[in-house]
Regions:
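Active-site-proximal or metal-binding-adjacent scaffold patches in catalytic folds
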Residues: 4-177, 186-221
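Walker B catalytic acidic pair
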Residues: 182
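Glycine-rich phosphate-binding loop
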Residues: 1
Length: 221
């Protein structure tokens, strides 16, 4: 039935892609689409907002050679010396030997450089939050970076915590909420009222930070 239909707005386009069972008539499908106009418009506006945010990020990166990581603005420069590369207090140095590198290759090097630094940087922030919140029901054992498509983080009963590497681009309040959320799972493995009470105790006003975090695009870089 039409419950199996899903809709996906085409990026940078006014088109709408609708997939539906072959047993459904065109008239029935069009009627269903018309009944979903409010939902479609809401999703379209949200998509356009994300595109504007992403566009601003890349314009800043390529025109001013600047990037903000963990709330700190840093200049981005290129070096042909490998040992000079890395993320530092006021700059990001990329090891690039070929001056004619493509934009896509440049971004690949940027991502690789940031990820290498982000593992330790995000782990240190997360473990600082842990120290403020403990003790927990389940022991914390290991920290991982993730590139998941839909989730900012996760925590298992084995004590494995995963945080999306894109977290380096969000604000301190958003990171505090994310760390609190995943750390709270070391005591409450579900999203029960007790879980959210625990989150609120350690991250007052978390709802605003959660809303902003989930309005962002995961994996845009």
């Amino acid at each position: 039935g039409l419950g199996d239909v899903y809709k996906r707005q085409m990026p940078n386009s006014e088109q709408l892609l609708v997939k539906y069972p072959t047993s459904s008539s065109r008239e029935k499908v069009m009627g269903w689409v018309l009944s979903q106009q409010a939902w479609i418009q809401k999703k379209r506006q949200k998509s356009l907002g994300k595109e504007d945010t992403n566009r601003a990020f890349f314009e800043k990166l390529f025109s001013e050679h600047e990037i903000v990581l963990l709330d700190v603005k840093r200049k981005v420069r290129v070096s042909s010396v490998r040992k000079e590369s890395g993320v530092f207090d006021d700059e990001v140095v990329l090891w690039i030997k070929d001056a004619n590198i493509s934009r896509e290759q440049f971004l690949e090097v940027l991502v690789k450089t940031i990820k290498k630094w982000a593992l330790k940087a995000l782990q240190e922030e997360f473990e600082l939050k842990l120290a403020q919140m403990g003790p927990f029901r389940y022991p914390y054992r290991k920290f991982f970076l993730t590139s998941a498509k839909t989730r900012w983080g996760s925590c298992s009963s084995r004590g494995h915590v995963r945080i999306h590497w894109n977290t380096v681009f969000v604000t301190k309040s958003e990171r505090d909420y994310l760390y609190t959320h995943e750390a709270a799972h070391l005591t409450e493995m579900n999203h029960s009222p007790r879980f959210w009470q625990l989150v609120e105790v350690h991250c007052p006003g978390y709802k605003r930070a959660r809303t902003i975090l989930h309005s962002r695009t995961l994996g845009f870089l």
